């Protein structure tokens, strides 16, 4: 029974999305339907946490806009997600970056990985 559930979850998981880690800055494009029209909305932010696994995996992004910190969570295997693009790789020593919540400006920055180490990650 356990193998059957795992097989079903593996079928539902998307493989076309970019590989990213906590601390990376990513750009997520999602389909938004307003009225009778559909458009693509892009949200760019720092990955604070990845939760779950398989078909129910989620990612939480943090972004500072106009001096206010904002968070948004995405279900990675959602059909609403068009694409995920890695903008830059970050260097962090934590699995969850919830300490970014109260920070703005330079305090909310994550060190960037540059060169060959960023390509390996």
From Swiss-Prot:
Keywords: Ribonucleoprotein, Ribosomal protein. GO terms for cellular component: cytosolic large ribosomal subunit. InterPro entries: Ribosomal_bL19 (IPR001857), Ribosomal_bL19_CS (IPR018257), Ribosomal_bL19_sf (IPR038657), Translation_prot_SH3-like_sf (IPR008991). One of its GO terms (biological process) is translation. This protein is located at the 30S-50S ribosomal subunit interface and may play a role in the structure and function of the aminoacyl-tRNA binding site. NCBIfam families: rplS_bact. Belongs to the bacterial ribosomal protein bL19 family. This is Large ribosomal subunit protein bL19. The lineage of its organism: Bacteria, Pseudomonadati, Chlamydiota, Chlamydiia, Chlamydiales.
């Amino acid at each position: 029974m356990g193998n059957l559930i795992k097989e079903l979850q593996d079928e539902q998981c998307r493989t076309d999305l970019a590989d990213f880690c906590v601390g990376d800055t990513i750009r997520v494009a999602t389909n938004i339907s307003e009225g009778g029209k559909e458009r693509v909305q892009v949200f760019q932010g720092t990955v604070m946490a990845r939760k779950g696994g398989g078909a129910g995996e989620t990612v939480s992004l943090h972004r500072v806009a106009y001096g206010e910190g904002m968070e948004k969570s995405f279900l990675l295997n959602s059909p609403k997600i068009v694409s995920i693009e890695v903008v830059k790789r970050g260097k962090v020593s934590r699995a969850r970056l919830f300490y970014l919540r109260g920070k703005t400006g330079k305090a909310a920055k994550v060190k960037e990985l540059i060169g060959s180490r960023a390509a390996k990650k």
